[in-house]
Regions:
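A gly/proline- and charged-residue-enriched helix-loop-helix capping module
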Residues: 85-137
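Active-site glycine- and acidic-residue-rich loops that bind
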Residues: 148-160, 188, 217-236
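Glycine/Thr-rich beta-alpha phosphate-binding loop at enzyme active sites
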Residues: 26-33, 37-40, 181-194, 228, ...
Length: 295
C-alpha cells in the first residue's frame, strides 16, 4: 500500500514544474516536523566518524533543504545525518528560472540554481529554534557553506570564514562547497594557490573557535587525476577533517540535456562519482572520512 501511495504522489508531483514540486515537498516536511514528540533516526549500522556518533550511515546531501526549513520533518524520515544549505553570508535569489530540469527516463536532474538561499542570518535563526526545541535525538546536522555570487574570487575565503564563525555552535560539522558548477569561478578554488590559501585560512578560523567542529570539503566529479591528487595532498597537509565526493557534473551523455547549462545529478553521475571516490580513497590517509554522494 505504501508503494502504491508513493507512486501516486510521485505522478502528481511530476505534473508540476520541478521547483514547484520541490517547494511543495519542503512545505509538507515542515508540517511533518511540527508533529509533537522526540525525533530519532532509524537505528542501523552505528559509526563513530569525525568524533560524532552516527546512528546510521544514510544521510541527505545539501541542496534539498537549502534554508534549514524542514530539518525536523526530514529527521522523521530516519536519516542518520542531514546537511542543510548551501548557505551564503547574504541572501541571494540564485539564477533565473527555469533552472531545474527533470529527465525521468534517465533518472537524472540538471540544475543551475546558483546558491539561491535566504542567507546566514535566516539559517542561524532556524537552527537556533531547532536546538532550543531539542527534539532531534541522535540526528547529525551539517551545514554546507558557499560564497555569494558577487564576492570576488580573491575574497571568497572570507565568506567561508564567516560561515565557520556563524555556525560553529549550531552545526555538528561544516562543509566547504567549492565545487558547484553554477557559481562562476568557484571551482578554481579547488586548484593551486586558491586551494592552499583557502585551506590555510579556514583551518586557522576553525582553531580560533571555542568548540572544535569538523570541516569537510565537497569536491567536483570533473577533476582530472592530477588535480584530484593535488587536492588530496593539500587536504592531508592542512589536516582537513573529511571529504565529500561529489558535486554535480558538467559532462553530459550524448542523449541527455545537451542544450541545458548546469550540473547533472542522478544515475548518469554514479560511475563518475564512484571513480573520484576511489581516487580520493587511494590518495588520502586511511583514517580520513569520505562521504559518498552522487548518482
Amino acid at each position: 500500500l505504501r508503494k502504491v501511495m508513493f507512486r501516486q504522489i510521485e505522478k502528481l508531483l511530476f505534473l508540476l514544474p520541478p521547483e514547484v514540486s520541490h517547494n511543495l515537498a519542503i512545505t509538507s516536511l515542515k508540517t511533518l516536523g511540527a508533529m509533537p514528540g522526540p525525533i530519532k533516526p532509524i537505528l542501523g549500522t552505528k559509526k563513530k566518524v569525525l568524533g560524532l556518533d552516527f546512528q546510521n550511515c544514510l544521510g541527505l546531501a545539501a541542496g534539498f533543504d537549502k534554508d534549514a526549513q524542514a530539518v525536523e520533518g526530514l529527521a522523521r524520515l530516519g536519516f542518520g545525518f542531514i546537511e542543510v544549505g548551501t548557505v551564503t553570508p547574504r541572501p541571494q535569489p540564485g539564477n533565473l528560472k527555469p533552472r531545474l530540469f527533470r529527465y525521468p527516463d534517465h533518472e537524472a536532474v540538471i540544475n543551475r540554481m546558483g546558491f539561491n538561499n535566504l542567507g546566514m542570518d535566516a539559517m542561524v535563526k532556524k537552527l537556533n529554534g531547532i536546538r532550543a526545541r531539542d527534539r532531534l535525538k541522535g540526528t547529525i546536522v551539517g551545514v554546507n557553506i558557499g560564497k555569494n555570487k558577487d564576492t570576488p574570487l580573491e575574497r571568497a575565503v572570507d565568506d567561508y570564514v564567516i560561515g565557520i564563525e556563524r555556525f560553529n555552535d549550531l552545526a555538528d560539522y561544516l562543509t566547504l562547497n567549492i565545487s558547484s558548477p553554477n557559481t562562476t569561478g568557484l571551482r578554481s578554488m579547488q586548484t593551486g594557490d586558491h586551494l592552499e590559501r583557502m585551506l590555510d585560512t579556514v583551518k586557522n578560523a576553525q582553531s580560533r573557535q571555542k568548540k572544535y567542529v569538523p570541516l569537510l570539503v565537497k569536491v567536483a566529479p570533473d577533476l582530472n587525476k592530477e588535480n584530484a591528487e593535488y587536492m588530496c595532498e593539500k587536504i592531508t597537509e592542512y589536516e582537513l577533517d573529511g571529504v565529500i565526493t561529489t558535486n554535480t557534473t558538467l559532462d553530459r551523455p550524448s542523449n541527455l540535456g545537451q542544450n541545458e547549462e548546469g550540473g547533472l545529478s542522478g544515475l548518469p553521475l554514479f560511475q563518475k562519482s564512484l571513480e573520484i571516490l576511489k581516487l580520493f580513497r587511494s590518495n588520502l590517509h586511511p583514517n580520513c572520512p569520505i562521504v559518498g554522494v552522487g548518482g
